[in-house]
Each structure stands twice: as structure tokens, then as C-alpha cells.
């Protein structure tokens, strides 16, 4: 269960990084 939780955290962190990259690129596009 602990290993699965660690995998979930890594997955969420990956989504967060993708989201931050999307937001930053969108902000740059709007300027």
C-alpha cells in the first residue's frame, strides 16, 4: 500500500509539473 501511495504521489507531482508548464506557456502566449 505504501509503495502504491508513493507511485500516486509521483503521478500527481508529474501532473502538477505538466500543469505548471501549461500555465506558464499560456501566460507567455497571452503577453
UniProtKB/Swiss-Prot annotation:
The keyword Thylakoid applies. It is found in: Plastid, Chloroplast thylakoid. Its main location: plastid. This is Unknown protein from spot 104 of 2D-PAGE of thylakoid. It comes from the Eukaryota. It comes from Pisum sativum. Keywords: Chloroplast, Plastid, Thylakoid. One of its GO terms (cellular component) is chloroplast thylakoid. On the 2D-gel the determined pI of this protein is: 6.2, its MW is: 16.0 kDa.
